[in-house]
Design a protein with these regions (language model features):
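Short amphipathic alpha-helix with an adjacent loop that forms part of the alpha/beta core around
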Residues: 41-45, 77-80
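Non-catalytic, surface beta->alpha helical segment in thiol-disulfide oxidoreductase systems
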Residues: 56-83
Length: 83
C-alpha cells in the first residue's frame, strides 16, 4: 500500500498549508518534524520543508514535492489513490 509522508517543522506556514490542504481532501498522511527527527530527514534526503513524499509499499520514493503546490499535490493524491 502506498503511503504519504510530510516532513515539516514548527511555525512553518507553508507546512500548515500543506496539512490543511491534505485534510480538506481527506487524505491520510504521516507528519514528521524534520528538526525533531534529523536522522530520518537526512536518510530521506530532505533539504527543506515542507517536503511531501509518496512511497510505495516497500518504502521506495515514487514522487516528491517541496513547498506548497496544490496542483502537484492533487497529482500525488491521484497516484496515491490509484494504488
Amino acid at each position: 500500500m502506498k503511503k504519504l509522508i510530510k516532513f515539516e517543522k514548527d511555525n512553518c506556514k507553508p507546512c500548515e498549508m500543506v496539512s490543511e490542504y491534505l485534510n480538506s481532501k481527506n487524505v491520510e498522511f504521516e507528519a514528521i518534524n524534520a528538526y525533531n527527527d534529523p536522522i530520518r530527514a537526512s536518510k530521506m534526503k530532505v533539504r527543506s520543508v515542507p517536503t511531501l513524499m509518496l512511497l510505495d509499499n516497500e518504502g521506495n520514493e515514487i514522487r516528491r514535492i517541496v513547498g506548497y503546490n496544490p496542483q502537484e499535490i492533487d497529482l500525488m493524491i491521484e497516484e496515491l489513490k490509484g494504488e
